Amino acid sequence: MISKLFGRGKFFRNVALQVRFNSSEAVEFRPLHSSLISRAELYVNELRELEDLLSQGGSFDLEKQKNFAKLSTIVDSYSKYREEVNQYKELQEILELDPSLREEAEADIAALLPDLNKTGDSLLNKLLPPHPFADKPSILELRPGVGGSEAMIFTQDLLNMYINYANYHKWKWNLISKTENASGSGVLEAILNIDEPGSYDKLKFEAGVHRVQRVPATESKGRTHTSTAAVIVLPKMGEESESDAYERTFKPDEIRIDVMRASGKGGQHVNTTDSAVRLTHYPSGIVISMQEERSQHRNKAKAFAILRARLAEKERLEKEEKERNARKDQVSTTDRSDKIRTYNYPQNRITDHRCGFTLYDIEGVMKGERLDDVIDAMDAFSSEQKAKQLLQDMSA
């Protein structure tokens, strides 16, 4: 049993359990809690039972097939984690028993630890309850905050970053709508659709206020300005799937649909038909306006897709709030709408204020190539918080 390893005093006597996110600090082993290891062992036994059932000619319905696939991924991750922990244990024993091999063992440990922690994080994510919209595509809404025209330019930069990120991962995307400022140098509002299943789970922690510190091109005295932009990340709900739990059929008295002529720049851009659509959802007060397409039908479909996404996210947040309020101790959350990240151009630094992760490569992040470094750090931090809550619930 791998859980017994965690009880060996010499092995873990000096191991720091605190999670480290700053990339400049030394890497240390972050062992999973023994209760989580026991949980993984339960999944191993459950998978064996399903395999025995299959070997005996038992029938597998759709639910059993889904469960088999889920358990297989967990057990595979657990097996890899256990193997790497055993390697780490052997190297630690070499350090204690054979001083002549100390330098080589230390080098091997330094090479092993990043992979071991990454494997542990992957296993932890599989052991935690999944996000209700983990498999959904995503819709990103971006709007400038404080900072005037520089905030609008920064909003355009963030939009480009997410498009670059989607291209880097070869995800399909399209702009649902984009409204530029008068000069065309910045964005007043942009709505980006990333049509990749699971992209919501990957991007959900991008929601919040992003802050930039840099010298604007129009600044003659070289002073650094601070501007902000707000990002909203929504799950894209199915439009036709009857099995989707959040698929809605709106009652006539819930929705008001207004159609009108689209506004434009004049000339060929003026739409002479009533193609623009505005939806008003009375129960929530949400209003969606859409005029990007020349077809009223397409504008209406896009507007309803955004409305479904906003309502689904609203219901999820309300449910989480009720669950938090039901606990005796208030649980910290990463769903805050305040400043989440700073992009400091003079220092070439990006810092996520929720988990404390810092990366010195703004260009790599804005190109989409290193955004995963920031996202993964926040994801690991969130998983740690969820694991703590899960352990509290298990011991209650």
From Swiss-Prot:
InterPro entries, sorted: PCRF, Pep_chain_release_fac_I, Pep_chain_release_fac_I_sf, Prokaryotic/Mito_RF
Residue segments, region Disordered: 317-340
Protein origin, superkingdom: Eukaryota
A single GO molecular function term of this UniProt record: translation release factor activity
One Pfam family per UniProt: RF-1
Keyword Transit peptide recorded: yes
Similarity comment: family membership: Belongs to the prokaryotic/mitochondrial release factor family.
Role played: Mitochondrial peptide chain release factor that directs the termination of translation in response to the peptide chain termination codons UAA and UAG.
Protein name: Peptide chain release factor 1, mitochondrial
Organism for this UniProt entry: Kluyveromyces lactis (strain ATCC 8585 / CBS 2359 / DSM 70799 / NBRC 1267 / NRRL Y-1140 / WM37)
Source organism phylogeny: Eukaryota, Fungi, Dikarya, Ascomycota, Saccharomycotina
